[in-house]
Amino acid sequence: MATGPGGVTSHGGCTEDDDDIKVAALNALQQMDPEKAGPVLKRVLARRDTQSVCLRRKAIFLLAQQGAEGAEPTLLDAARHDPDPEVREQAVFWLSQVGTDASVAALDSILRTTKDPDLMEKAVFALSQQGSDRSIQALRAYAERSDVSEEGREKAIFWLGQTGTSENIAFLRGLYGRLRGEELKKKVLFSLAQTGSKENARWLAGVARNQQEAPELRKQALFWAEQCDLPTSEFASLYGSTADRAMREQVIFVLSQRGDKAAADKLFEIAKSDPDKELRKKALFWLGQMDDPRVAEVLQDILEH
């Protein structure tokens, strides 16, 4: 908050004594005759001067509250061209609340044209709340773009995963193979893991097995696969299918978290016969944390031989 000339309080370019009366007039007009208020609100929103910032903020709220047909072009114009960030962001938010085909088209247009990362992020969220075919297509197109921020693409990927539809799951799996950035790939792994389906868990296990994939991504895929309801045998078999020590360490950890008989059996096998002494030691450590009556016998056997 700042104090303007003559001690007048100012909020982000708004002067209270200048705007209070005008805002009150807008409110009164809206309550008295919404049809007449519409054109007035649109004229207010067409202004770009600093003196009308607070008035425009109020006008965009009132216009959205009207729910009148044809508000989308005005909201879109404000989202694209208003010099005040708050007005632009409010315009995007209210476009998401209109819920018409025209509003989805407007949000899509913002995604395709704006260079403002904050506005892009809000448009991604707004589209994610629509649930229409067109909004989903817009999010998919945005997730594939390489000329926008990774953070925005990550959010589009996240929201696509939240829908849980088979079409979006198939899209995300296909997208994974086309992505180059590790962070974006990690977001796909995370989004698919959130569905909790065995089908996606097996797909994640497949990524973990892929020796052409980056080690960190393989470990991430294994971590998320473990959160799903896959049988322990899937993870036990993964140990033998990789020669990478870091991956084997991750498999040992995953097995230790399973805590069932099959996991203990595999850890016993590793502790007894793995040629890598460090991996045997890790298996022994985790066996010591498990509540399995056979552990003491195995440890004694190792000590005696």
Predicted regions and their residues:
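Amphipathic alpha-helical scaffolding segments comprising HEAT/armadillo-like alpha-solenoid repeats
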Residues: M1-G12, P34-R47, A68-R80, T100-T113, ...
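Short linear regulatory motifs and low-complexity interaction segments
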Residues: M1-L29, D33-R43, C54-L55, T74, ...
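Alpha-helical adaptor scaffolds
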Residues: A236-G240, R245, Q250-I252
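Ankyrin-repeat and related helical/solenoid repeat scaffolds used for protein-protein interactions
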Residues: E249-M290
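Alpha-helix N-cap/helix-start positions at coil->helix boundaries
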Residues: D19-D20, T50-C54, E69, D84-E86, ...
